[in-house]
């Protein structure tokens, strides 16, 4: 029996069958995820096809279950960034003029300078409580350390966000008040 479009049958090491979905857009092969059944994988493929063939210019905030029934939100962001800006980035980044947004979820958005694009396009950001980190060579690296904020620093005492937005990590928005490095 022939697979549905965009769907490939695969097998786990323990013998369980699962279905991978992918699409090719602008000569780029894009994985859409793994699914338990062929219909869900095909639905994700159909969602992605509808997005890239649509005349609409979608933005990340336009995500809804009526547009994407099976496609993950993070994959939505990657696809519309590729469609609108011409650059495919596997992490959920949407490029803006002189900065970019990194989407941890639809309502959890981080802002960075374009200078950090290369780093965050290759590192997935994770959140545990208020702790934001990337996995780097088996370690959890706090993203605040990239901006001179020490792990023991206290907000509004040792550093502050100039515009008050704790999710805005643009260099101009971070002011180090106490650059204490330890006793020398």
Which stretches of residues belong to each language-model region?
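Short acidic/polar inter-strand loop motif in beta-rich domains
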Residues: 53-56
